[in-house]
Amino acid sequence: MESQQDEAVQTKGASTSSDAQDQGAEKGAKNKTTEATEGPTSEPPLSGPGRLKKTAMKLFGGKKGICTLPSFFGGGRSKGSGKVSSKKSLNKSKTHDGLSEASQGPEDVVIEETDLSTPLSKSSAQFPSSQSANGALEIGSKHKTSGTEAIEKAGVEKVPSVHKPKKSLKSFFSSIRRHRKGKTSGADQSVPGAKELEGARTRSHEHVSSISLPSSEEIFRDTRKENAKPQDAPGPKMSPAQVHFSPTTEKAACKNPEKLTRTCASEFMQPKPVLEGGSLEEPHTSETEGKVVAGEVNPPNGPVGDQLSLLFGDVTSLKSFDSLTGCGDIIAEQDMDSMTDSMASGGQRANRDGTKRSSCLVTYQGGGEEMALPDDDDNDDEEEEEEEEEEEEEEEEEEEEEEEEEEEELLEDEEEVKDGEENDDLEYLWASAQIYPRFNMNLGYHTAISPSHQGYMLLDPVQSYPNLGLGELLTPQSDQQESAPNSDEGYYDSTTPGFEDDSGEALGLAHRDCLPRDSYSGDALYEFYEPDDSLEHSPPGDDCLYDLRGRNSEMLDPFLNLEPFSSRPPGAMETEEERLVTIQKQLLYWELRREQREAQEACAREAHAREAYARDTHTRESYGRNVRARETQALEAHSQEGRVQETKVRQEKPALEYQMRPLGPSVMGLVAGTSGGSQTSHRGTTSAFPATSSSEPDWRDFRPLEKRFEGTCSKKDQSTCLMQLFQSDAMFEPDMQEANFGGSPRKAYPSYSPPEEPEEEEEEKEGNATVSFSQALVEFTSNGNLFTSMSYSSDSDSSFTQNLPELPPMVTFDIADVERDGEGKCEENPEFNNDEDLTASLEAFELGYYHKHAFNSYHSRFYQGLPWGVSSLPRYLGLPGVHPRPPPAAMALNRRSRSLDNAESLELELSSSHLAQGYMESDELQAHQEDSDEEGEEEEGEWGRDSPLSLYTEPPGVYDWPPWAHCPLPVGPGLAWMSPNQLYEPFNQSSYVQATCCVPPVAMPVSVPGRTPGDSVSQLARPSHLPLPMGPCYNLQSQASQSGRAKPRDVLLPVDEPSCSSISGANSQSQAKPVGITHGIPQLPRVRPEPFQLQPNHYRASNLDLSKERGEQGASLSTSYSSTAMNGNLAK
């Protein structure tokens, strides 16, 4: 009765844990009677109605029974802070004392029967106290519940004798809503918890290590003992499942329905009898028993309490909220029932479900106050309990005898069942630990191996964290979380005393070693602190961001290898906070891994791009190198081929054959080419150079002619040499290729040698770039072979008119006066005494001296040994190696050469001289002339690139005229006749200045209109780089008959030469047409080509009439040469 009164006081809020202990002591006197009544209480159908009321009232004790588990976790103080010690007393009073007394008798019996059962009985007797005291901490409360079940089962026999349960129980449940809920939840949750437990055991069966909590074994043994007792009591033994279920329901409804539910479920689902485990556990149990007793005396040192506090601190945090607020006490207890059930069942799903329920209820904090027990209900409960206790005292004696017998039977059955189930329980406990295996974690847990050598770890928080005080395990945020989450909003704004004030004084748990839960505000999720620095080594750690070092090589390994989980003891189950932290860590870890992989992939892509770019660059460079190499090889091959061709040309070119003429003993003979002199050139002109088998010009020998043929011909004999040269058949050999500048001027003029310093002499002249025509004539004459006699020259095969393709570039033929009868194509030339005209002509020549494009490849080697330049003749006549083009348009008249300034006397004296020029051109030349006249204007724009004058001019200093041998040519008012003897007489240096004996027998290029442009486009009348030969005017008849081509040729006749009767009368002077030679381009009128045969004539010295009147009477054309002003009659 005292115990009932104490319970009533506690229900009102004034009782303490000591009261509960006193109550437990009384109950210990009543021992099994009390527990026997408990059995039917949870399941009224199984128990009598009279016992139920008393048992329920005694067990529940008003609020005492409900607060058994919460009181330990801080819920014992449900409505007042003065209930500090109620937790301890509640846990201890019922279970410990009752079990200890009840187990005394069975202990002896067991000792007598078997040796193995002796420690079991002791453990069952003493251990439930330790279990209730320390084991209350454990949420996997199978152990405690089974202990209480043992007591309950002890009184199962007396179930029928209980007659008051319905009234008291009915009033109790009607007044106390939470008891009914607790009972229902406990009974309902027992089954799913059992299922989950069974699944967990099944899964983790292989992985469970032998190490387990000693308290669990002992509690399980006690549980089986208690279960075995009630089985026999009702008469028909209930199956173990029923037995377990009934005590579970009892306990769930009474004290901790959740624990009982879990225990019953675990036993109900897996009643595996494992005798081996039981036998092994017995010595351990005895040792544990001592430790448990020590735990009662000195709770802080109780290893079971420490372990449970570490394992299930999160639930403590939940209950602390209830106990602190007082409002949510009932809700928290109910929630804790579900939590403990889920924890006991061991399923993570159940754990989560319980957590969710608790979370929902926690947010309900303020509203749960209406569910608190009123004082009236507590008073009613006290009265009922007193009545029940009286009845129990009467029945205790009867029950004791029956219980002893039941205990003996149960001990045997229980050990079989317990051993198997205990192993399963241990397997489950370790299954959660195996889910998060600890590899090498120095957590400081000091394991105490029991004598059974199964390696059960006894965890001591003081030893586990030797370097930390009990208060250092929680962060400030976590400390606030314990006391703070008591406001309706769930925030930490309350100053209610913290949980550490009175949470675990009796059990020595002044400070919990587990992190408390927050109020789902999420504020403290990332502020956890663990003494083992496991968070620092977690994947989100700085040193683990991109250096995962194989510990978590696989993406899913971190789930199985998270250090925050390993910080818990082996049997612990993860709390919600730990799970959230784990999830957060995993998210962070995966995010970092993803970023790492993205960075690696980006680096790989970048490296690949660089490699591709390098490959492309290398490919392009190699391709460029190959292309350049191929080009270089091609160029080398081309140059090699050119060199080979040049070598071949040089090899094929025959050696020069020298023919010594009798008149010139040292005259150098020219090559007597196989092609006869009678061969007619296709261009109407013949080559004056020795014929060679190669048509390519040879300009490579740059030595002066005099040096090349030193000693062969003296200056004294130059005239003789020239005569021999003219008499030579090869001198004017009609070779078309030679006419196209195939030969070198040195061949034609071998004795020519420019002075050593000709440029200084020329610099003194103002007409540096041009040479006076008289000077050119004299120089040409001195450099050419004059015929010894007209007969000899006529007998020779040379056709002078056609055989001068390469004359030295010389004078500017600026014809100032051109009169054409009836044609009108050339304007009348005004008087050539205008200084402006002279200036214009001089400026025109200054525009350019030579055509750069054409001379670039030839000027270097052309002018080195042959310093002659083109001044007045067209570009297509004067440039070597260039195919002839149509002549440009007629230049303006009134052009004078600068050489006039140096030869004014010549201009005065020779102004009246007439040019007797008969030009009978072949049909091809006539057609060319006609086309050139008509197309001259058009062609000028085509190929006059720089300037029309630049095509004919040449750089200054190229006229290095040597002091040629001079031929004495008398000049007078009458006809000037040159006797052959005069050709050999030397004359004064000054004589050649005034020597205007004859117009050089140059075949001017004339295109006769009336022909198609293609007839004689490439016909060349005369090369421009050879000097005009000086001498008497010849009628150089081409030897057409010898070449098989009888075509009209050019005829140069004296103005008044009646002796030239060999020319047919048809070619009379009356038919002569004026020819205008503008800038070296003769402009002939349309000549009617009357067919005739030119007979070979004796070329006699022409009569040059220097008088103007006579020239006007006898000549139809007055041609004024700017440099020599020579007028003559053109005779056809």
Curated annotation (Swiss-Prot):
Keywords in alphabetical order: Acetylation, Cell membrane, Cytoplasm, Lipid-binding, Membrane, Nucleus, Wnt signaling pathway
Quaternary state and interactors: Interacts with CTNNB1, AXIN1, LRP6, KEAP1, APC and BTRC. Interacts with SCF (SKP1-CUL1-F-box protein) E3 ubiquitin-protein ligase complexes containing BTRC and/or FBXW11. Identified in the beta-catenin destruction complex containing CTNNB1, APC, AXIN1 and AXIN2. Interacts with WT1.
Biological role: Regulator of the canonical Wnt signaling pathway. Acts by specifically binding phosphatidylinositol 4,5-bisphosphate (PtdIns(4,5)P2), translocating to the cell membrane and interacting with key regulators of the canonical Wnt signaling pathway, such as components of the beta-catenin destruction complex. Acts both as a positive and negative regulator of the Wnt signaling pathway, depending on the context: acts as a positive regulator by promoting LRP6 phosphorylation.
UniProt feature, compositional bias: Basic and acidic residues: 24-35, 195-208, 218-229, 281-290
Chief location: cytoplasm
Any one GO cellular component localisation term in the record: nuclear body
Sites bearing N-acetylmethionine, chain numbering: M1
One GO biological process term: kidney development
Record-level Gene Ontology MF annotations: beta-catenin binding; beta-catenin destruction complex binding; phosphatidylinositol-4,5-bisphosphate binding
Family: Belongs to the Amer family.
Locations listed in the record: Cytoplasm; Cell membrane; Nucleus
Biased composition range(s): Low complexity: 121-133
Residue ranges, annotated region (Disordered): 1-256, 268-301, 338-423, 469-505, 674-699, 736-770, 924-949, 1038-1132
Biased segments, Polar residues type: 1-21, 475-486, 677-696, 1059-1072, 1115-1132
Protein name: APC membrane recruitment protein 1
Tissue distribution: Expressed in kidney.
Biased composition (Acidic residues): 372-423, 756-765, 931-941
Membrane topology type: Peripheral membrane protein
